[in-house]
From Swiss-Prot:
NCBIfam families: tyrS. ATP binds at residue 232. Its main location: cytoplasm. Gene3D superfamilies: HUPs, RNA-binding S4 domain, Tyrosyl-Transfer RNA Synthetase. The gene is tyrS. It comes from the Bacteria. A motif ('HIGH' region) lies at residues 40-49. This is Tyrosine--tRNA ligase. Residues 354-420 form the S4 RNA-binding domain. Its EC number is 6.1.1.1. Signal peptide: none annotated. It is found in: Cytoplasm. Catalyzes the attachment of tyrosine to tRNA(Tyr) in a two-step reaction: tyrosine is first activated by ATP to form Tyr-AMP and then transferred to the acceptor end of tRNA(Tyr).
Length: 421
């Protein structure tokens, strides 16, 4: 190991809160074991999980041993939110989600080699623990006034209250840290910015139960320059890591549209580019922002990371093809559909009129027949990147991409997909 991992995280701005940083820096002079946990509260991880997850990868690359924990037990409870109780999901649903996110988690760290990662599920030691054992061995060490002082608990008590189930969540997570320390000598937990209270609970429980000194780090909460929560798509939903839930094209577009004020910070937090590379991109943003070099690099790195180089090449080709800089017929149907689905897709049923005028109106690119005719006469109407000059033009079978798709474009930038039934 050369640069200490703590120094690396510091210049990247990845340390939000921590226990004694000097002690942790000293501990990481030798290989340590650390963990981060992920509860299966949905069928997929989302973009917001990436910063803590990539912390494990950073530590592994620095010569440390990561443990990835899937919360098969804690996912049955749910970490308390600021507002309202979580919906209780069935055991079968949580088990299925735990399996799905375990597959996703395994893509981001290396499970072979000298510092091979481990994948564990806290259901292994939690599900068979009796209530009496839990209360005596774990609950005994948690003063009620400390638990009530937690910010989330205080906010809930001021509004609609909190159930004993969710109130106990921090004890379950604290016990995970103790178990991982006993089993694997794990001495560090990393987590998201909202996990500090839970992490400190685990640090305290290790000290009380085992007399062990362990450590904790949280990463910053990722927001954009306007304070909006990171990772929400243009439609308002989460950016999922599962390509069936968020297409690689939508994923790529989210990052390529990052604001100048955000892009360098995102590159520091989400990629493994060196300080020198990031400094060069920061100069590009400051001096030539119109080129959007940093945004293109961010989108490429993030899509490679989550979906692989082949998917990245496909979405970059799609982005070029939509604006006439590549051949639309070279796109596979899945990528084509994802790219045109950024806007509402018009469907033309059998027997419905399908002249270029009708298609422009149906697609929403124009709002009247007169506007459609003006667009055509001014040379601004395109189908599959071919200019259309006749008002009565209709598509033939050979025009349909993958037998059913047309890509309409008005001018240089406005496009829409049409599906011919």
């Amino acid at each position: 190991m050369t640069t200490n991992i703590i120094d690396e995280l510091s210049w990247r701005g990845l340390i939000n809160q921590s226990t004694d940083l000097d002690a942790l820096r000293e501990a990481t002079q030798e290989p340590i074991t650390l963990y981060c946990g992920f509860d299966p509260t949905g069928p997929s991880l989302h973009a917001g999980h990436l910063v803590p997850l990539l912390m494990l990868r950073r530590f592994q690359q620095a010569g440390h041993n990561p443990i990835v924990l899937a919360g098969g037990a804690t996912g049955m409870i749910g970490d308390p939110r600021d507002v309202g109780e979580r919906t209780m999901n069935s055991a079968d649903t949580v088990a299925e989600w735990a399996e799905r996110i375990s597959d996703q988690l395994s893509r981001f760290v290396d499970f072979e080699g000298e510092h091979a990662a481990r994948l564990v599920n806290n259901a292994e030691w939690t599900n068979n623990m009796s209530v009496v054992t839990f209360l005596r061995d774990v609950g005994k060490h948690f003063p009620l006034n400390t638990m009530l002082a937690r910010d989330t608990v205080k906010r809930r008590l001021e509004t609609d209250g909190i159930s004993y189930t969710e109130f106990s969540y921090m004890l379950l997570q604290a016990n995970d840290f103790v178990e991982l320390n006993r089993r694997f000598n794990c001495i560090l937990q990393v987590g998201g910015g909202d996990q500090w209270g839970n992490i400190v609970s685990g640090v305290d429980l290790n000290r009380r139960v085992q007399g062990k000194s362990v450590h904790g780090i949280t990463v910053p909460l990722v927001t954009d320059s306007e304070g909006k929560k990171f990772g929400k798509s243009t439609g308002g939903g989460s950016l999922w890591l599962d390509p069936e839930m968020t297409s690689p094209y939508s994923w790529y577009q989210y990052f390529i549209n990052a604001a100048d004020a955000d892009v360098i910070r995102y590159l520091r937090w989400f990629t493994f580019l060196t300080k020198e590379e990031l400094d060069e991109l920061e100069v590009e943003v400051a001096e030539r922002p119109f080129k959007r070099e940093a945004q293109r690099r961010l989108a490429r790195e993030m899509t490679n990371l989550v979906h692989g180089e082949e998917a990245t090449a496909a979405v970059e080709l799609a982005a070029q093809a939509l604006f006439g800089r590549a051949e639309l017929r070279d796109l596979d149907e899945k990528t084509l559909e994802a790219s045109v689905s950024e806007t509402e897709v018009a469907e033309i049923q059998p027997g419905e009129p399908r002249t270029i005028v009708d298609l422009l109106i149906a697609s929403g690119l124009v709002d009247s027949r007169g506007a459609a005719r003006r667009t055509i006469s001014e040379g601004g109407a395109y189908v599959n990147n071919e200019r259309i000059t006749a008002d009565d033009w209709e598509p033939s079978e050979s025009d349909l991409l993958h037998g059913q798709w047309l890509v309409l474009r008005k001018g240089k930038k406005n496009f829409a997909g049409v599906k011919i039934k």
